[in-house]
Amino acid sequence: MIVRDFRQSDLNDLYRIASLSLDEEYAPEIFDYFRLQWPAGQLVMCLPDGRVVGFISSSKMDMSTAKIMLFAVDHTYRGSGAGSKLLDALKMKARMEGIRTIILEVRPTNMRAVSFYRHRGFVPAGILDNFYNDGGPAIKMICNF
């Protein structure tokens, strides 16, 4: 599998993966918005044939902090290392720009994601009440590297 920068031609694949993988609904334009915010923080995971199977979209919060806004891997490829490779690539891009902290939010009920992030250096930093559209809380997680 190959990690590369987001291309406009990836938009339909990203939207499909997000719609099938994430609890919240997002308009396709959200990917363009994040790309304009921080182009280096938009990565996709591709198979050798070019098919997109995962993505990570992030924003630069300040000179030393980035925030993962959306992160999803097609359910068929979960557990394959695709998510880890995407996160490692984001950390590398962030490090090259002087960023040393990445933050994110995750549902407390998404134990698989919470465990994934913990095993990759993220630690809980609080609970955000009424964070999601359905009123559900989020765990704020931080990784310093």
Language-model segments: which ranges?
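Short glycine/proline-centered loop/turn elements that form peptide/ligand docking sites
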Residues: 87, 110-113, 130-135
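Residue-level recognition of the GNAT/N-acetyltransferase active site
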Residues: 74, 78, 105-109
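Conserved acetyl-CoA-binding loop-helix of GNAT-fold acetyltransferases
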Residues: 79-92, 115-119
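Conserved catalytic-core motifs of GNAT/GCN5-like acyltransferases
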Residues: 103-105, 118, 123-140
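Extreme N-terminal starter segment of soluble prokaryotic enzymes
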Residues: 1-3
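Acetyl-CoA-dependent GNAT
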Residues: 5-76, 87-89, 93, 97, ...
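Conserved phosphate-binding and hydrolysis motifs of nucleotide-dependent enzymes
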Residues: 50, 54, 81-83, 121
